[in-house]
């Protein structure tokens, strides 16, 4: 399978402490790396207001990860664990054009 570029955007709940947020980001970056992905960039985008409440929150911190991988294993594991995390309100995985 050929190497493809992906962008993952996820929203972190706004009331999380800064230390817990950086642990969360590190944990999910490690999940991607441990499953064969190469992370090119992982950064906070900004805290933004939502158009509608998500899990009773009206704003959240957006985090963006750019990565490359040649298998779906890293993406599937990220997707599975992000669904269970109460600290991640929403997430989206997008395949970028080569």
From Swiss-Prot:
- GO biological process annotations for this chain's record? translation
SUPFAM superfamilies linked to this entry:
Ribosomal protein S6
> Which keywords does this Swiss-Prot/TrEMBL entry list?
Ribonucleoprotein, Ribosomal protein, RNA-binding, rRNA-binding
Query: Which Pfam families does the UniProt entry name for this protein?
Result: Ribosomal_S6
Q: What GO molecular function annotation could you give as one example from this UniProt entry?
A: small ribosomal subunit rRNA binding
Which GO terms of the cellular component aspect does the record hold? cytoplasm; ribonucleoprotein complex; ribosome
Q: What does this protein do?
A: Binds together with bS18 to 16S ribosomal RNA.
Which NCBIfam families did the record assign?
S6
**Which protein family is named in the record?**
Belongs to the bacterial ribosomal protein bS6 family.
What name goes with this protein? Small ribosomal subunit protein bS6
